[in-house]
Amino acid sequence: MDKNKINELKQHYPKDTRVVLIYMDDEQAPPIGTKGTVIGVDDIGSLLVRWDNGSRLNVLYGIDKVEKIVEK
C-alpha cells in the first residue's frame, strides 16, 4: 500500500476513533457488532484496534470491514 493511502486511512481513522466491526475474516474475530477504539494505523494500512471485549486483532485493509461510530 502506498504512503498516500496510509495517510488517508490515518486521517479517516485518527487515534481514539470509535468503530464497530462489520466483518472480519478470522476464526478468532470478535463478534460482528463489537465496538472498539482505533489506536493507530500500521505501515501496511491495518487498523490497530483495542476491541471492547479485550481482543487486539487488527482490521486488515481490503479484507475486513469496520464503520466509524458517529456521535450525535
Which role fits each region the language model picked out?
Residues 1-72:
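Basic/aromatic-rich interaction segments and small domains that mediate binding to polyanionic partners
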